């Protein structure tokens, strides 16, 4: 009798784990909020060449690496 109860429990647990059994709110995956990609750190170079105006502003506000025309930035 104990063996039958144990097998039934394991079978129902396997169905829930596979998502074929009870579909309650706790068996669904948690959706992650969409996060906008940020400018990667390798874009914020010290030479300020080849980056856009938006990237230059982002580097200046986040990292303190501010590009100026005198340093070679031509945005």
Curated annotation (Swiss-Prot):
Residue numbers of Serine amide PTMs: 74
Lineage per the UniProt record: Eukaryota, Metazoa, Ecdysozoa, Arthropoda, Crustacea
Role: Antibacterial and antifungal activity. Presents chitin-binding activity.
InterPro entries, sorted: Penaeidin
Keyword terms, alphabetized: Amidation, Antibiotic, Antimicrobial, Chitin-binding, Disulfide bond, Fungicide, Pyrrolidone carboxylic acid, Signal
Subcellular location: Cytoplasmic granule
Pfam families linked to this entry: Penaeidin
Similarity field: Belongs to the penaeidin family.
Protein name, as recorded: Penaeidin-3l
GO MF annotation terms: chitin binding
Residues modified to Pyrrolidone carboxylic acid: 20
Biological process, per Gene Ontology: defense response to bacterium; defense response to fungus; killing of cells of another organism
Disulfide bonds: 44-59, 48-66, 60-67
Signal peptide, first to last residue: 1-19
Species this protein is from: Penaeus setiferus
GO CC annotation: cytoplasm
